[in-house]
Amino acid sequence: MIDPACGTGGFLLSSYEHMKGQSHEIAKQKFLKNNTFFGADNTSLVVTMASMNLYLHDIGVDNSPIVCQDSLIDKSDRMFDVILANPPFGTRPQGSVDVSSNRPEFEKTSDNQVNFLQHIMSIVKTGGRVGIVLPDSVLTDTGATARVRRKLLDEYNLHTILKLPTGIFYAQGVKTNVLFFEKGTPTKEIWTYDYRTGIKHTLVQNPLKRSNLDEFVKLYNESTRKETYSKDNPNGRWRKYPIDEINKDESLNLSFKWIAEEDDDDKTIGEYLTEMETISADLASSVAKLKDLLEGVYDD
């Protein structure tokens, strides 16, 4: 498995902790530590920290599995069975190598998350599994982003979306999701768990805990999935969207909403501030995209 934007290696270590108890055979433990986990980051200091982090857990002792590289311009033909990633938010840093010139098969966009999604789609093996953290914009934007979504639905099985509260992975106010998909068969239906509407977490007073997602994990792992949403229970958080219904929307908007929002009169000042931060984050993202477009015009 690989994390192509691994940072200090948190996803890799969590995966190791999850897997290490599955077998006590010495050969399998050795393979797990030396031949299972790989990561990449484009900052040398971060790569060093990730390597040390794994080394302290006896992973990659002889040869670090973390490389310093820009994953978005990596043309190696290595494929992976499992990919976990939380790509950096926003646009590429100024001075970075142009992605489209190195990856002409990609839909041309300056959106970092969309490019990482395209990269991950290109390196997962047939039958391989992906879990990737992405902002709402990747589920809603038109143009190149919508075309990437079209390819994702046509060539991969995007079976599950977990909607998270704002501020969990990115800055406060940015709405995030975890997309789960497999390569090899087209999407027939998308199961969505809304752990956002009416849910509020803060880093200090009410941090997100593993137990908060117990219901999602249980529903996700059921051999026969059943919706908790129904006409009699319109606020059920687990809902299925068939591909025929999704295709009726020409924009392929995948940010599904069905749970009623609370009335404004019930909101606290802190919640209003969070909404303002959300609007500010969306505005900053739009301004960044506009700057990219204007730079392209001036370059021409």
Predicted feature residues:
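Conserved S-adenosyl-L-methionine
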Residues: M1-A85, G90-R92, S100-N102, S110, ...
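A conserved structural/catalytic subdomain of Rossmann-like adenosyl-cofactor enzymes
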Residues: D74-D300
